[in-house]
Amino acid sequence: VIGGDECNINEHRFLVALYHSRSRTFLCGGTLINQEWVLTAAHCDRFFMYIRLGMHNKNVNFDDEQRRSPKEKYFFRCSNNFTKWDKDIMLIRLDSPVNNSAHIAPLSLPSNPPSVGSVCRVMGWGQTTSPQEDLSDVPRCANINLFNFTVCRAAYPWLPATSRVLCAGDMEGGIDTCNRDSGGPLICNGQFQGIVSKGQNLCAQPRKPALYTKVFDHLDWIQSIIAGNKTVTCPP
């Protein structure tokens, strides 16, 4: 996160870190949505990966930190009216459930769609500078604004006219999610509304908000898979 501050140690109990299990490199963020499931971005997927839960500083292990491997992964395969930008979402089932603890607790799915103009919270261990690849050892948090989708269409003319993505950032620049913040949450008015997906190659540029997969528009799919329906019908 660019332009943020170190997150309060108690404000990100649902934030998880995805790692490559062979190189041990940090890949992405993710969000614990119940004891057994993590929601992240599809572009974070790697064949070999593990998940750290209850982590703050990458180099310090809390007593209650837990590690899990993916048992199952689900991707949004719908084709009707969905573009590739609408599909940057992945559900990971953990190989065993995690227990709530001082540094681990899930974040519930949204009960309402987000409203344009909301102030939203982003967090992650990603780049703190751009284009230099300075990663953070601790998660950084920042507040950004939720814009009408047309703002992102003006910034990225290749975007389709309608999309199940959210557009959020700081129009003046200087505050943004960046590389390796991918997969982490966008929290608007206390609700988990977006997944960090894509932005400009140079992060935190003026008038270039980032794109976030809209969690609310994928709720039926998420809830069906968690309920055990593996052949989920696509939304209309």
From Swiss-Prot:
User: Which UniProt keywords are listed?
Assistant: Blood coagulation cascade activating toxin, Disulfide bond, Glycoprotein, Hemostasis impairing toxin, Hydrolase, Protease, Secreted, Serine protease, Toxin
Q: Which residues are glycosylated?
A: 81, 99, 148, 229
Recorded GO cellular component terms are: extracellular region; secretory granule
Extract the InterPro entries matched here: Peptidase_S1_PA, Peptidase_S1_PA_chymotrypsin, Peptidase_S1A, Trypsin_dom, TRYPSIN_HIS
E.C. designation(s) = 3.4.21.-
List localization entries.
Secreted
List residues of the Peptidase S1 domain: 1-227
Molecular function, one GO term: serine-type endopeptidase activity
Q: How is its activity regulated?
A: Inhibited by 4-(2-aminoethyl)-benzensulfonyl fluoride. Not inhibited by antithrombin-III.
Q: How is it modified after translation?
A: N-glycosylated by units composed of Fuc, Man, GlcNAc, Gal and NeuAC residues.
Which residues carry out catalysis? Answer: 43 (charge relay system), 88 (charge relay system), 182 (charge relay system)
* BP-aspect Gene Ontology terms: positive regulation of blood coagulation; proteolysis
The record's listing under Gene3D superfamilies reads: Trypsin-like serine proteases
Please describe what this protein does: Thrombin-like snake venom serine protease. Cleaves bonds after Arg and Lys, converts fibrinogen (FGA and FGB) to fibrin and releases both fibrinopeptides A and B, and fibrinogen peptide Bbeta1-42. Has a blood clotting activity.
Q: Quaternary structure?
A: Monomer.
* Family assignment from sequence similarity: Belongs to the peptidase S1 family. Snake venom subfamily.
| Protein name per its UniProtKB record | Thrombin-like enzyme kangshuanmei
